[in-house]
UniProtKB/Swiss-Prot annotation:
InterPro entries: Lysozyme-like_dom_sf (IPR023346), Murein_transglycosylaseC (IPR023664), Murein_transglycosylaseC_N (IPR024570), Transglyc_AS (IPR000189), Transglycosylase_SLT_dom_1 (IPR008258). Residues 1-15 form the signal peptide. It catalyses: Exolytic cleavage of the (1->4)-beta-glycosidic linkage between N-acetylmuramic acid (MurNAc) and N-acetylglucosamine (GlcNAc) residues in peptidoglycan, from either the reducing or the non-reducing ends of the peptidoglycan chains, with concomitant formation of a 1,6-anhydrobond in the MurNAc residue. This is Membrane-bound lytic murein transglycosylase C. One of its GO terms (cellular component) is cell outer membrane. The keyword S-adenosyl-L-methionine does not apply. Its main location: membrane. It comes from Haemophilus influenzae (strain 86-028NP). A lipid is attached at C16 (N-palmitoyl cysteine). It is found in: Cell outer membrane. The keyword Lyase applies. One of its GO terms (molecular function) is hydrolase activity, acting on glycosyl bonds. Its EC number is 4.2.2.n1.
Length: 357
């Protein structure tokens, strides 16, 4: 099982985390939010260290759903990137059975779910994992009867045991997702994506490529930088820009951004801002697309500084280049390795979605 140390999340400021580098102030409200998040994650990690051991910290992230239950003695981990589900417990098998059922039947609404507490996630009549996992008989897991029978089968036939470094014994099951689970999740959001694409004039395949790279279509996605949801919008940077564009004050709340419709609208709005404001002077549409992708990750200012410290000069230089040259520079010269890799990943994902449309 893949382990995620909380401290390893600190350096990564995922999508929209740098906005436009236009001198945005980190105000008192943001400072309080950040301090609150630090306290919460500190308490959370202390509980995990105490129960699971110092090398067993597993936390929710952009492409990983992680939920602790039973006072942190049971946990469920859905890797949306790797396509695998692991559910494990240090308690009795009834707890494991319950966790399997609740994980398979969890809903898609992340607004009311606190991933940093140990309560059960409600069972939904419209499970988010429906179509992404099948039981031992190849059935879709659509209701509590099927989920319960599958949980019983897993415990009787697929149960595994491991010992933690702190001496505790863990019993767990592993459930693979179907081969095309990413595409199944993507289809769930196509109506919202198409609506936003038409509204803001942004290519549908670009939105899909960014969303896959950001969250692998995980509606519960969160990063330590407090990037939220499917398109990993950071409230105090890109979120503020989007609200300002819409004539609103302040910034979107976490609950607001955990709504898929709001999140997709905010992410695509930010792409519109990049396209029509921060990178407006770039004339070649392909060069602009490369710059937009890179800027979604590292900020428009950081992208332009790759070419020149002066914005107008940077845009002039970009306009003198072929798109292939712009792409090569952004994927080899950009000072952020994350930004370099980001453009490679999104461009590849976008091409895949273009072919499948």
């Amino acid at each position: 099982m893949k382990k995620y140390l909380l401290l390893a999340l600190l350096p990564f400021l995922y999508a929209c985390s740098n906005s436009s580098n236009q001198g945005i102030n980190y105000d008192e409200a943001f400072a309080k939010d950040t301090q609150g998040l630090d306290i919460l994650t500190g308490q959370f990690s202390h509980n995990i260290d105490r129960i699971w051991g110092v090398n067993e910290l597993l936390v929710a992230s952009r492409k990983d759903y992680v939920k602790y239950t039973d006072s942190f003695y049971t946990r469920s981990h859905v890797s949306f990137d790797e396509g695998n589900i692991v559910i494990e417990t240090q308690q009795d098998l009834n707890r494991l059975h319950n966790a399997i059922v609740h994980t398979l039947l969890m809903g898609a609404d992340a607004k009311g779910i606190d991933l940093f507490t140990s309560g059960d996630v409600p069972i939904s009549s419209r499970p988010f994992l429906l179509g992404q996992v099948v039981d031992h008989q190849g059935q879709q897991i659509a209701n509590q009867v099927i989920a319960s029978n599958f949980a019983t089968y897993l415990i009787q036939n697929k149960l595994q045991t491991r010992r933690l470094q702190n001496g505790h014994t863990v019993q767990f099951v592993s459930v693979p997702m179907i081969a095309n689970h990413v595409e199944v999740r993507a289809r769930k959001y196509l109506p919202l994506i198409r609506k936003a694409a038409q509204r803001y004039g942004i290519d549908e395949s670009l939105i899909l490529g960014i969303m896959q790279t950001e969250s692998s279509f995980n509606p519960y996605a969160i990063s330590y930088a407090n990037a939220i949801g499917l398109m990993q919008v950071v409230p105090h940077t890109a979120g503020r820009d989007v609200f300002a564009m819409k004539g609103k004050g302040g910034q979107p709340s976490t609950r607001y951004l955990y709504d898929p419709a709001n999140n997709i609208d905010a992410g695509v709005s930010y792409l519109w801002i990049l396209q029509n404001q921060y990178l407006d002077g770039i004339t070649n549409p392909t060069s602009k697309r490369f710059a937009m992708i890179s800027a979604y990750n590292s900020g428009a200012g950081a992208v332009l500084r790759v070419f020149d410290n002066d914005k107008d000069t940077a845009i002039y230089k970009i306009n003198q280049m072929y798109p292939e040259q712009v792409y090569r520079i952004l994927t080899t010269v950009h000072p952020s390795s994350q930004a370099r890799n980001y453009l490679l990943k999104v461009d590849k994902a976008q091409k895949k979605f273009r072919v499948r449309r």
